[in-house]
Amino acid sequence: MSLISAVEDRDIHNIGKTSGGGSRTSSINSSKKSLKHGSKSLRKPKVYQTTGEPLSREALYKAKLKYGVYQSPAQSYSIGVSDAHAASDKAANLAHDNQTTVEAYKRMFIDPNATKAASKMGPKVVRNNSITSATSKTSKESQTKRKSKESPGAAASKAYSMTMETTSLSSQTNSRSYSITSASSVLSGASGSFNSTVNPKPKTLNLEKVLVGAEKKAESRIKERWEPEKTNFQYGVKTDEHGNLNQFSFSNEMMNNIMAKVDAPKAQDLQKVKKVSAEKEAKSMKFALGAANAVKDMHPGEDIDKSIALKAQKRETYLSQLTSQQVLTLARANVDRQLDIIEKSDMHRKLFTNMEYNKAAVAVAQSNHQKKTEFHNKINMGGGLFLSPEDITKIASGLISPVLGEVSERAEAQRAMDEEIAERTEAYNKSLNEWETMERSIISNDAKVLTTTANRHQTEKKTSQEKIKASFDALVARMDTKVAERETLLEDTKSKEIEFKKQMQQELKDEKARLDQDLEEWGKKCEQDITEARKEQEELLKPYHDDLANAEAEHKTLVEERDEINAEISRLQDAIVDHKRKISGYGNDLDAQKNRNIREDDKLLELGQTKESLESHLNDDVIILANKAKEQAELSTKEARLKQLEVDSLINERKSELNATEIELKKEKLNLLEAMKDVASARGDDKIDEEKVKKLIGMTSEEYLTQNKSVEKNVEDLPTQLEKIEEGDELKKEEIVGAETKNSGGDGVPVSTAAKEATETSSAVQTKEPEEKISIGNKSSGKEDANDCKSAEHSKEISVSQKAGNNKSLGVSPDSLEHTFSGFSQGSSIEDDQDAISNQEKK
């Protein structure tokens, strides 16, 4: 059994949908007709015919209509709500925006039964159309046009089929251009129609003012109902349904269109077309008049015929009297006034003043509304069965949707496959045809190209040969003339060349004699300048040579001192090894003495020896400890001395390297000065450029010579200062040695205290790190031997001699050597020497 009843083709547009025009009548009548057809058995749509060919589009469309594809609940609109899924929201919005009392008046359609009832109840009016023949003709034409253009959207105007049609006539007369004959006819027709009766029933009372006020009041009430005041609150989801309902308003223009049985846009279009046609006609007449005036005299030089001129003047005066503007305005005002009177006389025939018509329309609307409420939001399924959209969707999704989906999928797949096969075959055939045509065109083009190229080559060959021959002849003639000109020019140049050679030989002889004389004078002058420059060079380089000799001597002394220090280091290392060996022997003796003391203690306890024998044994132990402490002190002093000598050797190596670099620098300086002198002598200058010397050396040559003289004086005074320092050191050493001999001589000091002091000094020496002057501190403690004093004196003499040797040529104040080449290194070494001398004097 099919759940969707079959529908005839003529009733398809009336089921489940509203009409496309302004009237939205219900589809109950059409659905009742469809109920007569019984339910038919469901048949699957055949996509292909028995012969295997696919169905046409029309057959597929009818099959889908038959099986309800286009009338499915998901696609069709219900009677009550357009979208069944959003029925609750739309119902809430409609209830809020449009009240039920207003909804009846807001309907943009009227039931045909209501219009028929209103038309029957209204009185029929007999119109006297005796204005003019032209107006009656236009009224008939307008009636026929309106009947042909009448649409379902203008159903409300059927009730006024017998009303007057002067509104359209007034619009036509206003838009058209007036002429003399039309004005006269209008005046005559209007004078005759003033006495005619408009209505069959005579009016006893003048209710014009009452009717006008009632009409205004009714319009204001209807406007309040049509466009109620909106509140500030909302319910539910807002939609645009209310906007679609209020897209029309019953204004005066709309009412005039309803009375004319024409829709608003169509009436506007008609008016626009009439205006455009009138403008075109006026323009054409204007252009024709201008053309006639322009062509009336083809020969402007000839005189105009007097009879023609008089006729034209009479015609102009006559037309000016007949078609004056005042006459036309008066005629137009009279016509407009009469038309307004005619329109106002039919007030009882208007829509809102006809109470009987409104009552009949409301009664029909209420009856239709009661019929609709029974099956509200339900769909007629046939056989008196009405189902809601939800039930239909459930049934369709459970039974019909899968089958239809599978059928449609297979049909679409097969159709797509057939289309693809057809496209492929068509494309293949097309490409094959194109390829064949291309091959044929290539063969024909090749044959044509060969013939054309051969002919073209022959013609080009002939033309090129002719051109080459002509150009060759012209070139030969041109070259012959040039050769003749060049030969004459060559003879002239040869004669000029002989004269020029003679002149140049004489000039060369004179120039050679002059240059020989200048060369002799210049050679004598250069020899004199060279001798003077050499003398100046020797004077300038003398201090540099002296500095170089002093630096080389200083380098030799430093090398000798380094060798002596290395020999002293090797000797001290041997002594340290010897002392370590002795210390190990003393340690063994101490261990043996401890064992002996233990044995002696046992013997004293056993035998009870005397006090003297015990003291003698104790004194031996103390002596051994003192000797051990002494050896340790000697070892520490010699290690300190070794480190001091290593430091001195490193210092000497650095100084020797510094002196070597200074020597190289001085040599380079001398080479630079010699080069500068050579350059100056080559240029012929008497002196060296002092500015360049100042940039390189830091001072001029004269300042450098005076400074080197002061340095030499300070170097001469340096040995006397060193001798005084050495004498003071020797006196201090003698005092230290005398004090040590007194302490070692035993001036009432016990041996045990000396041993303790020796151990304390040795431990202090071992804990402290050796510095550069640790030997002097150990000497001042008064706990060292005479040999150590001698070695210290020897080392001090070596250091003093080293410093004296290093500073033989540079032992001056740092201010005097501030601007020399090696001023930084020399000044730093001099400051170190002065610090060492001051420390020794303080001690």
Swiss-Prot record:
Polar residues compositional bias, start-end: 127-137, 163-176, 798-810
Pfam family, one: Eisosome1
Keyword Cell membrane part of the UniProt annotation: yes
Superkingdom field: Eukaryota
A Gene Ontology cellular-component term: plasma membrane
Modified residues (Phosphoserine): 2, 88, 130, 182, 401, 584, 710, 763, 775, 816, 828-829, 838
An annotated GO BP: eisosome assembly
Basic and acidic residues compositional bias, start-end: 781-797
Record flagged with keyword Acetylation: yes
Modification N-acetylserine, positions: 2
Biased composition, class Basic residues, residue ranges: 33-46
Phosphothreonine modified-residue sites: 720
Protein's cellular compartments: Cytoplasmic granule; Cell membrane
Biased composition (Low complexity): 752-764
Entry keywords, A to Z: Acetylation, Cell membrane, Membrane, Phosphoprotein
Membrane topology reported for the UniProt record: Peripheral membrane protein
Region of interest called Disordered, as start-end residue ranges on this chain: 1-54, 120-176, 717-843
UniProt cross-references to PANTHER family, sorted A to Z: EISOSOME PROTEIN 1 (PTHR28298:SF1)
Function (record text): Required for normal formation of eisosomes, large cytoplasmic protein assemblies that localize to specialized domains on plasma membrane and mark the site of endocytosis.
Family per similarity comment: Belongs to the EIS1 family.
Name by which UniProt lists this protein: Eisosome protein 1
